């Protein structure tokens, strides 16, 4: 039988730590229930995905653990190409240890 569950896409615009954790918590719950999921980073949230960013919000509480969990649960991570440009971030500046798709909104 074909999976008829609708995909949950959470668009994350802010780099606020608690909102990042909340978004990943929602995604993790849906993904654990075998619902297709995508976390779309735009606005200032793209800064969280920079390599060696000591100020990354993935250093907050269990954020890195949640990120790895949603990746293990097959969540698609997408970054807005316009947000990269607006924040003067190049594709090579993004973390290379995880698969990040770059697309337009």
Regions from the language model: what does each represent?
Residues 19-39:
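Histidine-anchored nucleotide/phosphate-binding helix
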Residues 52-57, 94:
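Short glycine-enriched, charge-decorated loop/helix-capping segments at active-site entrances
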Residues 27, 64-68, 105:
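Short amphipathic alpha-helical segments and helix-helix/interface helices
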Residues 44-48:
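Short active-site-proximal "capping" loops at secondary-structure junctions
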Residues 55-86:
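A glycine-rich helix N-cap at a beta->alpha junction
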Residues 84-105:
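N-terminal glycine-rich phosphate/adenylate-binding segment common to multiple enzyme folds
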Residues 8-21, 49-53:
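Short, glycine-rich nucleotide/cofactor-binding loops
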């Amino acid at each position: 039988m074909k999976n008829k569950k609708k995909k949950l896409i959470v668009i994350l615009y802010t780099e606020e730590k608690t909102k990042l954790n909340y978004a990943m918590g929602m995604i993790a719950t849906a993904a654990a229930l075998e619902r297709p999921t995508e976390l779309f980073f735009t606005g200032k949230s793209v800064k969280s995905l920079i390599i060696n960013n000591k100020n990354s919000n993935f250093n907050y509480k269990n954020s890195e653990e949640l990120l790895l969990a949603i990746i293990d649960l097959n969540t698609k991570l997408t970054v807005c190409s316009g947000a990269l440009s607006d924040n003067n971030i190049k594709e090579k500046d993004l973390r290379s240890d995880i698969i990040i798709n770059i697309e337009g909104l």
